[in-house]
């Protein structure tokens, strides 16, 4: 089943909307953004989430000890590094936050530079300087995320064949196009912010529900297709 993160959560209301709709994770932006929250806000909002819903703090080039302190205070279950963080940064962060999930955002160009065109060749975990999952996002000179723009899915398709690590797709997703993104890329997870909002920082209940429904419909159809293929191979 596709992992779904609703990012840019700014209130208990929005957290409740995402949780009731079936999100697997909430994202809290701790860097300058229209969706930025304070550590106190993130902690308070996170208390409404049941244990099975992950709480991911999103950081951009934060000082290591500061990030670790915030993550502990907010009781995040994971952190998403959305800046220029290096492999050495990730390794050191793991010593400060042992056992915490680490996600690292990359653009399609950065992803292409990390592997041959023939397929995904990420070093498998548990190497300390490698994140647990890569988040493939669109970026502009003005914004590192939350652009509302998609990237070239066809170009990315060849890079996501048989990945050794999970890949999460973000960038311009909404209920209308997430099915096509899933069919093209078959990622481990999807991440959405602007595509389910009334305006930046305010989630639209209907848009959140429709997005998650679209993902689950794809999952159901994909599972049924796999089941039919399995039965056919047994004949």
Question: Model segments located where?
Answer:
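A short, Lys/Arg-enriched amphipathic alpha-helix followed by its capping loop at the start of a domain
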Residues: 17-23
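Conserved anion-binding
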Residues: 25-34, 40-41, 47-164, 168-169, ...
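C-terminal helical cap(s) of enzyme catalytic domains, especially alpha/beta-barrels
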Residues: 40-49, 92-93, 193-235
